[in-house]
Amino acid sequence: MSTYDEVEIEDMTFDPDTQIFTYPCPCGDRFQISIDDMYDGEDIAVCPSCSLMIQVVFDKEDLVEYYVEANLEPPGKIAVAV
């Protein structure tokens, strides 16, 4: 699969309400990928308006801060009652 570009997660915009990362596409729309898809190993963000895709460069550990920003418990964490 051919991608338009590689983009670091830090260069993307995260919306904590929708839990979606976005990045400007040359067509005028925005590439999109959800934080849950990224946690599940997906690293390709797609543009809903054209056929372009980008590869998002990140480590799974990078996602924890974004889950916290969205007031969500990161997957894989076990809540412990005290």
UniProtKB/Swiss-Prot annotation:
Q: Where in the cell is it found?
A: Cytoplasm; Nucleus
- Specify where it is mainly localized: cytoplasm
Named cofactor requirement(s): Fe(2+)
List GO terms (cellular component aspect): cytoplasm; nucleus
Q: Which reaction does it catalyse?
A: [3Fe-4S](1+)-[protein] + Fe(2+)-[Dph3] = [3Fe-4S](0)-[protein] + Fe(3+)-[Dph3]; 2 [3Fe-4S](0)-[protein] + 2 Fe(2+)-[Dph3] + NADH = 2 [4Fe-4S](1+)-[protein] + 2 [Dph3] + NAD(+) + H(+)
The GO terms describing molecular function are: ferrous iron binding; iron chaperone activity; oxidoreductase activity
* SUPFAM superfamilies registered for this protein in UniProt: CSL zinc finger
Q: What region holds the DPH-type MB domain?
A: 3-59
Q: Where are the transmembrane segments?
A: none
Gene3D superfamilies the UniProt entry points to: DPH Zinc finger
Where Fe cation binds, per the record, is at: C25, C27, C47, C50
Listed pathway(s):
Protein modification; peptidyl-diphthamide biosynthesis
UniProt keyword annotations, A-Z: Cytoplasm, Iron, Metal-binding, Nucleus, Oxidoreductase
One GO BP: tRNA wobble base 5-methoxycarbonylmethyl-2-thiouridinylation
Query: What is annotated about its quaternary structure and interactions?
Result: Component of the 2-(3-amino-3-carboxypropyl)histidine synthase complex composed of DPH1, DPH2, DPH3 and a NADH-dependent reductase, predominantly CBR1.
Q: Sum up the protein's function in the record's words.
A: Required for the first step of diphthamide biosynthesis, a post-translational modification of histidine which occurs in elongation factor 2. DPH1 and DPH2 transfer a 3-amino-3-carboxypropyl (ACP) group from S-adenosyl-L-methionine (SAM) to a histidine residue, the reaction is assisted by a reduction system comprising KTI11/DPH3 and a NADH-dependent reductase, predominantly CBR1. Acts as an electron donor to reduce the Fe-S cluster in DPH1-DPH2 keeping the [4Fe-4S] clusters in the active and reduced state.
PANTHER family per record: DIPHTHAMIDE BIOSYNTHESIS PROTEIN 3, DPH3 HOMOLOG-RELATED
Comment block on domains: The DPH-type metal-binding (MB) domain can also bind zinc. However, iron is the physiological binding partner as zinc binding impairs the protein electron donor function.
Regarding protein family, the annotation reads: Belongs to the DPH3 family.
What name does UniProt use for this protein?
Answer: Diphthamide biosynthesis protein 3
Its source organism is: Kluyveromyces lactis (strain ATCC 8585 / CBS 2359 / DSM 70799 / NBRC 1267 / NRRL Y-1140 / WM37)
Q: Which gene encodes it?
A: DPH3
